[in-house]
Amino acid sequence: MEGISIAKLLIIGALIVLLFGTNKLRSLGGDLGSAIKGFKKAMKDEDTSATRTTAEDVPAERVVHKD
């Protein structure tokens, strides 16, 4: 087996365009782009929240009671 050639990919692409139409493919591409953008934003937010200092990370001050 030699794999998928460029000619086969073009035929598959033409069949997909005929089945779904260009408008449907355009909206599908936009939806996919929005999903990827949202995923990247969520990953960035997770990275910044992991680097924030929490109260547990900061050493507490020593309190001395005078009797």
UniProtKB/Swiss-Prot annotation:
Which residues does UniProt assign to the signal peptide?
none
Q: What is its main location?
A: membrane
Q: Where in the cell is it found?
A: Cell inner membrane
Listed disulfide bonds for this chain?
none
GO annotation, biological process:
protein transport by the Tat complex
User: Which InterPro entries has this protein been placed in?
Assistant: TatA/B/E, TatA/E, TatE
Q: Which UniProt keywords apply?
A: Cell inner membrane, Cell membrane, Membrane, Protein transport, Translocation, Transmembrane, Transmembrane helix, Transport
| Transmembrane feature ranges | 1-21
Pfam families from the xrefs? TatA_B_E
Q: Which domain of life is it from?
A: Bacteria
In the UniProt record, does the keyword Cell inner membrane occur?
A: yes
Q: How does it sit in the membrane?
A: Single-pass membrane protein
Mind listing the GO molecular function terms for this protein? protein transmembrane transporter activity
Residue ranges, annotated region (Disordered)? 46-67
Give yes or no: UniProt keyword Nucleotide-binding.
no
The cellular component terms of Gene Ontology attached to this UniProt record, alphabetical and capped at eight, are: TAT protein transport complex
**PANTHER family, A to Z:** SEC-INDEPENDENT PROTEIN TRANSLOCASE PROTEIN TATA, SEC-INDEPENDENT PROTEIN TRANSLOCASE PROTEIN TATE
Q: What does this protein do?
A: Part of the twin-arginine translocation (Tat) system that transports large folded proteins containing a characteristic twin-arginine motif in their signal peptide across membranes. TatE shares overlapping functions with TatA.
Instruction: State the family it belongs to.
Output: Belongs to the TatA/E family. TatE subfamily.
Q: What's the protein name?
A: Probable Sec-independent protein translocase protein TatE
Q: Which organism is it from?
A: Pantoea vagans (strain C9-1)
Starting at the broadest rank, the lineage of the source organism is:
Bacteria, Pseudomonadati, Pseudomonadota, Gammaproteobacteria, Enterobacterales
